[in-house]
Every structure is written in structure tokens, then in C-alpha cells.
Amino acid sequence: MAAAGRFGLLLLIVLWTMVTVVLPASGEGGWKQSRLGTEAAVMEEERCTVERRAHLTYSEFMQHYAFLKPVILQGLTDNSKFRALCSRENLLASFGDNVVRLSTANTYSYQKVDLPFQEYVEQLLHPQDPESLGNDTLYFFGDNNFTEWAPLFQHYRPPPFRLLGTTPAYSFGIAGAGSGVPFHWHGPGFSEVIYGRKRWFLYPPEKTPEFHPNKTTLAWLLEIYPSLAPSARPLECTIQAGEALYFPDRWWHATLNLDTSVFISTFLG
């Protein structure tokens, strides 16, 4: 519990010490943000209780993970072209005038707001305020116009695994450091980080987590996580750029973007 408390404190300090600036484009695609006078990235905890598997076979996936537990996939696809297209400069040039639909970052995401993609990136894409509620925080994820974004999505190579009777559907998103979606559940799928880092917290369907649906994941991490007994802790891990997390059907999960993050999920509906 002491380690969890230190993690939360470090996260809060790094997120909210000084003024945010966007670093020049590099290996982070121009998305990386920092704060003057602080470390360049949000601290992460080393704890990881989700298996990482490189070059997993379909047989192994079906036998050990598909209906049983999450797994982090490495080395299954090459999305270097898609990643290059997702740089800040390229996305603004290609889709800056497109109207995107933002959702509130709470469990039920009731509120929707439409505005130009460039306005979202330049004015709303900033680190999460720890005092803000999830239902007051706007977040670009999920509601994609597949016709308008098809020139981008056609270059994405999803993990090659499918479940019988399901059809894949993409959900593309970009969010600021410290943002995320609190605990919720839905059908199975994969979530790949293109730029940045995203921390996941997961519970099996039969174990409902303690959380407030309108509070942010950051608030949960600072207020509830440190007091959890070891037996009550979720499975958790930080997904790095180029990795994809598989989550089985109806698993509870919450996410926390440790950097400004670009990500895409493949839902198996």
C-alpha cells in the first residue's frame, strides 16, 4: 500500500507542477507533452500482473486467454506505417477540419459534443485536472466516422486473432496525460497503443470494483487504490507503444493515459 501511495503522489506531482508544452515531433510523433521544470513524462509504477506474450499462436491464444484472462500481445503485427500516419502533424493535415464527436470520460459517457478535430487537439487535449469529474471531461474515443477516417484505418493491421461469430470494429482515440475512462465492461477486444503509454486496471466479471462512475480513473487511483488490500487489487499493467492488450468478454476495466496517447481498439462484437 505504501508503494501504491508513492505512485499516486508521483503521478500527481508530475501531472500538475508547471505549464504544459508540446515537445517537437520525434519518436513520439509530436504528441508528447511535458511541464517546464519537471520530468518529461508521467511516472509509472513497475507493477505488472498481466502476462506479456511475444509471437503468440492462435492455438495458444484460444487455449489460455480468449475466454479466461487478459494478455499483452507483442510482435504480432507491423503498424509502422499506421503509426507514421498518426503523428500529430499528419493527423492535423489530413483530418484537422473533420468534425469529431467527443464523449465524457465517465462510466456511461452520456454527453456528446461535436467540434473540429484541430480544435480538440489544440485547445482541449491537455493533462487531466485531478479535481475534475469524469462527466465534465471530454475525450475523443469511440465515436468515429468510419467513412471520413477510412483513409487512415485502411492502414491499420489489427491483431490476427478472432472469436467465432464476431465481427471486428475499430475505435480510435487520442487523449491527454492523466485522462482515462473509469471502470466499465463490454464485449471482448484488443486495444493497441500507437503513441504514449496507457495503464490498465482489470477485474474479472464476478468481481465488481469499488468506484464512482462519475469520477476519473486518476481520482480512483489517488483515493481508492492505495487502500486496497492485496487480494482486492486488480490485474494491472502499463501498455507501451506497439503493444496490444486483449481483454475477454465482460471484464471490468479502467484506463489511465500516462502520456498524451494515441490508441486504437478492435472490438469483437
From Swiss-Prot:
Post-translational note: N-glycosylated.
Subunit (UniProt): Oligomer. Dimer. Interacts with PKM; regulates angiogenesis and metabolism.
Entry keyword set: Cytoplasm, Endoplasmic reticulum, Glycoprotein, Signal
GO molecular function terms noted in the UniProt entry: cis-regulatory region sequence-specific DNA binding
Name this protein carries in UniProt: JmjC domain-containing protein 8
Species classification: Eukaryota, Metazoa, Chordata, Craniata, Vertebrata
Subcellular location: Endoplasmic reticulum lumen; Cytoplasm
Glycosylated position list: 135, 145, 214
Annotated JmjC domain residues: 147-269
Pfam family, one: Cupin_8
GO biological process: positive regulation of canonical NF-kappaB signal transduction; positive regulation of sprouting angiogenesis; regulation of glycolytic process; regulation of pyruvate kinase activity
Cross-referenced PANTHER family: ARGININE DEMETHYLASE AND LYSYL-HYDROXYLASE JMJD, JMJC DOMAIN-CONTAINING PROTEIN 8
Matches recorded under PROSITE patterns: JMJC (PS51184)
Top-level taxon of the source organism: Eukaryota
Gene3D superfamilies: Cupin
Function: Functions as a positive regulator of TNF-induced NF-kappaB signaling. Regulates angiogenesis and cellular metabolism through interaction with PKM.
InterPro entries per the UniProt record, alphabetical: Cupin_8 (IPR041667), JmjC_dom (IPR003347), JMJD6_ArgDemeth/LysHydrox (IPR050910)
Signal peptide boundaries: 1-24
A GO cellular component entry from the record: endoplasmic reticulum
UniProt source species: Rattus norvegicus
